[in-house]
């Protein structure tokens, strides 16, 4: 058995020398499936590595103290706390700008007082600690940050790069465990670079070291700080789902190529069996062939996936930073298990795609192998099985939907993806039976039109070879329509929401201690119609009381205070109230609160429920008057009237929205404010600028989604093109007799295009309702479970028309090259094809 295997393998592979198009089709499917999946996983692996490094440093390992009034802490306050024996440590945080304009986070610490459990403190040896603490000090950074400083890794140790403002960093020391785009140095060196004087950003301590905050400070426990990995989990799950979809579409190409190759090698397999090769040996050799080709395609795909990840990583990093404040390195950091996992997934997909082919080849006996129609003879039974499989997939989708209806709105993210996957599978399995039914009806209608009747019958013969490519096209079209409609609806909702929230033409952000003076000054300005003061603080949601039960939670939340003035309340959107908008705002003025949709979804809250909130030294019981949308915020938020928030939680001011009279001179007011209170250039922001920044963030957020959607559609087009190219020779053999009977080549070429265009049009018709169902699943289930907000369902007729047009155009483009080859074929070549019949 093993002695003859090399000869049998060489014989099987010789088929691809005669049919290189099929080999290209098979490798193409493996390549694109592996490339898109590996690219997504490379992005996810790099992001999670960045999160792990950030978590190990400070964010979730230290309790944090800040001043209750929002004013900056000072070294004197820190020294006073140390003198009382409290185990606290100072921290200074700011930003520096490199010469290429990149902003890096600079953190100054005192490692002598920092908790010994912290990752940085553990990394210091006595020698390195001395260098870290004394001039010229050290700058510790991850290798990812070197590119922003314009320094090669080999030249980094000991280098002192110059920043955009001309200042020089202390000598560099590489620390791979640090998060990306972060510089760590002694607090004295950081104070010089940031020119912070006596101010520090916060005071920290080991988790649980202090039972309560010292007087005048607020305490945020390490356990209450959400990690970047927790906040971004749903984002990465969405990316994984898109990568998995592209992987499945790529496997359709592989499946089609394997089936076509086996059909065309039936005579070869018969000969090998007659020569004494056993069925088991043949299947083992076919498996070895699959493994060899799979390794080639998978390795090429993984290499391409890394290139794709490098291309998309900057946009993903910008999105995660904008949405979640999560820093992600700009360089790929791939562990060994990424490479092994990518290879395993690619080969596993090949086994999945090839198992059916191997099983059917093993079951064909020698007599059947001699029949060239043996493969096609079972297709009618396959259509029946596809119909039954589609019905089963639809039943699973309906069962998941029924189960989701019984769950709280924020649960069921994985089940939601399962529901969409089941709908895609059901539709894909039903497509070939639907096409077969349409062709059967057309054959009956065209029985008196010989050429059209032949074209329909010919399409029925092509259907077994084209069905997988059409299924891939259906999935890609429906996904494009579904995701495109979701993004378009989100854009409309988001822009409308911005218009409702941003009612003031000018917004002021100033140091907390200046707000009282600024507010008093603005009260005397004739051009100011209304001042909308906002406040921010943090609290813990301890318990929720509903008519049915009381629940203990301990959930950290944001507190946000607004001024319910005449300019704001008519526009502020509310999703749910107990007794109407007017009653909700009246209750809000008297101390009731609104909760954002994220918190209401996560904790199953509704108007009328009571909340018990606590903060250091404060405990309040409040009633919910309404639920409001809060797109883009990953955290739960409780909204209060600004005076109520100041009185109950001593929250400092955070901004003032200035509503002006129509004839106000905005430029003069800006200049007067800036001069009077010595404000920085970024203290005043107009409404248009805020909207522009928000819209840029929105567009950047969906850049990778659009890219993956386009790539998935391109993969489906390649699947169809590869299927047509691989069978181009057999198609010429089928068309040559018609040419010999007098049908012009141009007419046959156009007829071939019409066949594919019609099949693609039917596929596009099925993709439209499927795309609408996907849009519904995304806005009603996936978004609610992943982000906490539900979007309105928008349908775009133009998008549907584009879907139909795209289906036809993709099919025509895929069929154009084979049709052109036939059109240009010489009469001698066509006569030779006819003679072979």
At which residue positions do the language-model features occur?
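Alpha-helical transmembrane segments, especially those used as permease/efflux helices
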Residues: 2-6, 10-25, 234-237, 337-357, ...
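Small-residue-rich transmembrane alpha-helices
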Residues: 255-258, 292-324, 337-363, 391-405, ...
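Alpha-helical transmembrane segments
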Residues: 27, 34-60, 259, 308-319, ...
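Short cytosolic juxtamembrane segments of multi-pass membrane proteins
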Residues: 363-379, 823-837
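Juxtamembrane segments of multi-pass membrane proteins
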Residues: 65-70, 427-581, 597, 609
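Membrane transport/envelope proteins' first extracytoplasmic loop
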Residues: 2-251, 260-263, 279, 314, ...
């Amino acid at each position: 058995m093993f002695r003859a295997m090399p000869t049998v393998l060489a014989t099987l592979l010789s088929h691809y020398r005669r049919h290189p198009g099929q080999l290209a089709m098979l490798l193409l499917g493996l390549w694109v499936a592996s490339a898109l999946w590996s690219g997504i996983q490379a992005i996810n692996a790099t992001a999670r590595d960045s999160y792990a490094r950030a978590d190990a440093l400070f964010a979730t390992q230290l309790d944090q103290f800040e001043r209750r009034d929002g004013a900056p802490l000072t070294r004197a306050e820190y020294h006073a706390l140390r003198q009382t024996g409290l185990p606290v440590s100072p921290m200074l945080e700011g930003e520096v700008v490199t010469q290429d304009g990149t902003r890096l986070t600079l953190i100054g610490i005192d490692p002598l007082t920092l908790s010994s459990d912290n990752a940085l403190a553990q990394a210091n040896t006595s020698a390195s600690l001395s260098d870290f603490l004394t001039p010229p000090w050290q700058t510790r950074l991850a290798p990812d940050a070197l590119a922003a400083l314009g320094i090669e890794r080999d030249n980094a140790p000991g280098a002192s790069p110059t920043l955009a403002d001309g200042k020089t960093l202390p000598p560099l020391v590489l620390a791979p465990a640090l998060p990306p785009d972060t510089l760590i140095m002694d607090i004295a060196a950081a104070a010089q670079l940031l020119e912070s004087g006596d101010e520090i950003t916060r005071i920290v301590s080991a988790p649980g070291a202090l039972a309560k905050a010292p007087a005048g400070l607020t305490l945020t426990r390490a356990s209450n700080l959400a990690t970047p990995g927790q906040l971004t989990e749903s984002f990465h799950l969405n990316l994984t789902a898109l990568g998995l979809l592209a992987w499945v579409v790529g496997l359709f190409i592989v499946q089609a190529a394997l089936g076509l190759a086996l059909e065309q090698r039936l005579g070869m397999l018969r000969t090998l069996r007659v020569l004494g090769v056993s069925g088991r040996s043949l299947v083992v050799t076919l498996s070895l062939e699959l493994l060899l080709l799979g390794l080639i395609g998978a390795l090429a795909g993984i290499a391409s996936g890394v290139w794709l990840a490098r291309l998309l990583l900057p946009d993903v990093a910008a999105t995660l930073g904008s949405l979640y404040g999560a820093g992600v390195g700009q360089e790929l950091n791939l562990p060994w298990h990424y490479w092994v996992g990518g290879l395993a997934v690619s080969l596993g997909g090949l086994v999945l795609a090839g198992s059916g082919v191997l099983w059917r080849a093993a079951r064909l006996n020698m007599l059947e192998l001699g029949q060239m129609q043996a493969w096609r003879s079972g297709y009618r039974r396959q259509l029946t099985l596809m119909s039954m499989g589609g019905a089963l997939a639809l039943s699973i989708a309906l069962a998941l939907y029924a189960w989701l209806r019984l769950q709280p709105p924020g649960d069921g993210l994985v089940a939601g993806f399962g529901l969409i996957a089941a709908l895609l599978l059901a539709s894909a399995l039903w497509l070939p039976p639907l096409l077969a039914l349409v062709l059967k009806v057309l054959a009956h209608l065209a029985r008196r039109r010989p050429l059209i009747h032949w074209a329909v019958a010919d399409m029925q013969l092509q259907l077994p070879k084209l069905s997988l490519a059409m299924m891939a096209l259906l999935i890609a079209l429906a996904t494009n329509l579904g995701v495109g409609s979701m993004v378009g609806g989100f854009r409309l909702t988001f822009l409308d929401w911005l218009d409702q929230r941003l009612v003031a033409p000018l917004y002021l952000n100033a140091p907390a201690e200046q707000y009282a003076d600024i507010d008093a000054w603005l009260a005397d300005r004739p051009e100011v119609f209304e001042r909308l003061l906002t406040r921010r603080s943090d609290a813990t949601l301890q318990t929720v009381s509903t008519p049915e039960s009381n629940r203990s939670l301990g959930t950290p939340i944001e507190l946000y205070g607004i001024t319910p003035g005449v300019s704001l309340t008519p526009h502020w959107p509310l999703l749910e109230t107990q007794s109407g908008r007017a009653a909700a705002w009246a209750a809000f003025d008297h101390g009731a609160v609104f909760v954002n949709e994220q918190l209401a979804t996560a904790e199953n809250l509704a108007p009328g429920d009571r909340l018990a909130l606590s903060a250091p030294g404060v405990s309040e019981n409040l009633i919910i008057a309404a639920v409001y949308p809060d797109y883009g915020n990953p955290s739960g938020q409780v909204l209060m009237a600004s005076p109520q928030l100041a009185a109950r939680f001593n929250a400092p001011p955070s901004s003032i929205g200035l509503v002006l009279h129509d004839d106000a001179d905005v430029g003069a007011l800006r200049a007067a404010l800036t001069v009077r209170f010595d404000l920085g250039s970024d203290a005043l922001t107009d409404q248009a600028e805020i909207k522009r920044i928000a819209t840029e963030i929105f567009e950047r957020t969906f850049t990778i989604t659009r890219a993956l959607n386009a790539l998935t559609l391109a993969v489906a087009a390649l699947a169809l093109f590869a299927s047509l190219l691989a069978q181009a020779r057999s198609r010429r053999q089928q068309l040559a007799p018609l040419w010999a009977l007098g049908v012009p080549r141009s007419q046959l070429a156009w007829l071939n295009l019409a066949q594919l265009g019609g099949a693609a049009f039917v596929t596009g018709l099925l993709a439209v309702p499927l795309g609408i169902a996907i849009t519904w699943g995304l806005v009603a289930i996936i978004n609610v479970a992943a982000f906490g907000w539900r979007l309105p369902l928008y349908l775009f007729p133009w998008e549907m028309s584009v879907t139909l047009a795209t289906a036809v155009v993709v099919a025509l483009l895929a069929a154009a090259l084979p049709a052109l080859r036939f059109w240009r074929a010489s009469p001698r070549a066509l006569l030779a094809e006819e003679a072979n019949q």
